[in-house]
UniProtKB/Swiss-Prot annotation:
It holds the Pfam family eIF-6. This is Translation initiation factor 6. The lineage of its organism: Archaea, Methanobacteriati, Methanobacteriota, Stenosarchaea group, Halobacteria. PANTHER family: TRANSLATION INITIATION FACTOR 6. Keywords: Initiation factor, Protein biosynthesis. The keyword Calcium does not apply. HAMAP family: eIF_6. It comes from Halobacterium salinarum (strain ATCC 29341 / DSM 671 / R1). GO terms for molecular function: ribosome binding; translation initiation factor activity. Belongs to the eIF-6 family. GO terms for biological process: cytosolic ribosome assembly. It comes from the Archaea.
Amino acid sequence: MLRAAFRGSAYIGVFARATESCVLVRPDLDDDFVDSIADELGVPAVQTTVGGSSTVGSLAAGNSSGLLVSNRIRERERDRIEAAGVTVGELPGAVNAAGNVVVANDDGAYVHSGLSDDAVAAVEETLDVSATRGQLAGVDTVGTAAVATTDGVLCHPKATDAELERIEETLGVYADVGTVNYGAPLVGSGLVAADDGYLVGDDTTGPEIGRIEDTLGYIE
């Protein structure tokens, strides 16, 4: 576990996205810090923007099969990610901040209820999983409201039992609720997780960390 802030912000999930293949991070972080992030998550780090924006956590989602990004990605950004051996796909349509609207692991993808058929097809093709539309706590931006690994998914504290059951069925893992950064309900904004480790915003409390570790499988 690594408590972190990116340029003074505890909302690290906005600026980083981890899969089991790599972690994207905003490009203006110190090299030693980036090395610490890669070591904690057990995957190589790729420093990049997406569409010229440093909010790469909001604009990318993925799993071991690939990385789905906003269709505003530039060619040189795509080349940088693909150079790390990662397959890149683009999310079509107006709702294209992939990290905000997709939460995925290697068993499934749970996506914004308003995604078009073409967008859902892009999710399924890039990530090689079946996708299910839905909400969490009535929130369509499910990528901000949940964080998943291959062992669990942590969700918005007001997610309903029916929503938790639906995301469990989709991702094939245990789901529970929690918060980050001293009560923030959009857990995706302050948590970056992979199977080997995780980063949390530096305002996250001990009880919040306990729930993260229990839900995402870091405690055996």
